[in-house]
């Protein structure tokens, strides 16, 4: 049974997270110490440098030869079931929206956005920071290595899946947009960052409005490439005529351009998303860490100290700055629960009920029992990982839900996990 001192260890792990979030909230809400552009820059640093280094460190120090096969299989099955179920719902919702017409389609956000959000909330827990001290008090030191194995699978597979879906949505938007006309007949390279995007737009309350695509590089080139490849696949003569008008200096009205824009080919959209994924540091960090782990634990050597200390300096900023960024995000909203209480309650149900229940059934299917089964279910009831908010804010997709899930989830997770611990022990 978990003791009072072990509960205090969990509180010790929680307190620094809220300290960073409170500091970020107060710095923006009351002290006005950071502008919207600077807040976007902080989050961009975390996504571009701190998190990839943390990923590399976690993956490279995990002994892949001693991973628990049944736990990994149950974790993979849980996430696969959730993702496939959400994708099936998204396809059904998309077909229903098509039948309802363009107005109904415009009134509802993309189902794929909700797939990413619900999947992240349900299946990507804060395993290391919250899970290790909590499960250590419940099940002993054996839980620490098991938690690390789940984190490694998240970083190597599931976060890359999430990023691919983000990039897929961005590629579809870019491909569906008409190619920009140029008086010289050539596309322009216009790199943009979250800092520039935040500086370029503001809402009626003076808050920064997030751009649809924070990491776009040479988007105009990609749009033109997509249009050209679609034309090669057999686009109607209207597109060719429109291209001739642009090259001769005639610019059609925006409505006509949008109406005549060809539907992007699925294979080209996927190819553009894959190319973007291969340019992201997280992809390199996870697979380089995996390669290092395979070699190092096979040959029995360790990381040079100078490299290890350099990585330590960067990776220690990841969690603190992630929580700080979450606090600055909430401070820039008009209310403390940005997504609203109904959506917040819905996300808590997904996090603390749907995720653990699916994990329970997945574990039983794999044949797990005893302490291993209990650890698998309880870790699924841990709060949302801070990294999920970082990517949601970076790609500007339901960051309000993610920030609420992180902040409220840490408060709720302790009593919820204790309830699961008691129920599983009956």
Curated annotation (Swiss-Prot):
GO biological process: auxin export across the plasma membrane; auxin polar transport; auxin-activated signaling pathway
GO MF, one annotated term: identical protein binding
Annotated (indol-3-yl)acetate binding sites: 51, 126, 128, 159, 386
GO cellular component term, pick one: plasma membrane
Residues on Cytoplasmic side: 28-38, 92-114, 167-286, 332-347, 393-405
Repressor is among the record's keywords: no
Tissue: Expressed in roots, leaves and shoot apex. Expressed in roots, stem bases, stems, leaves and young panicles.
Keywords: Auxin signaling pathway, Membrane, Transmembrane, Transmembrane helix, Transport
Membrane topology note: Multi-pass membrane protein
Topology, Extracellular side: 1-6, 60-70, 136-145, 308-310, 369-371
Chief location of this protein within or outside the cell: membrane
Transmembrane stretches, start-end: 7-27, 39-59, 71-91, 115-135, 146-166, 287-307, 311-331, 348-368, 372-392, 406-426
Superkingdom of the organism of origin: Eukaryota
Record function comment: May act as a component of the auxin efflux carrier.
Protein name as catalogued: Probable auxin efflux carrier component 9
UniProt organism field: Oryza sativa subsp. japonica (Rice)
Lineage start: Eukaryota, Viridiplantae, Streptophyta, Embryophyta, Tracheophyta
Gene that produces this protein: PIN9
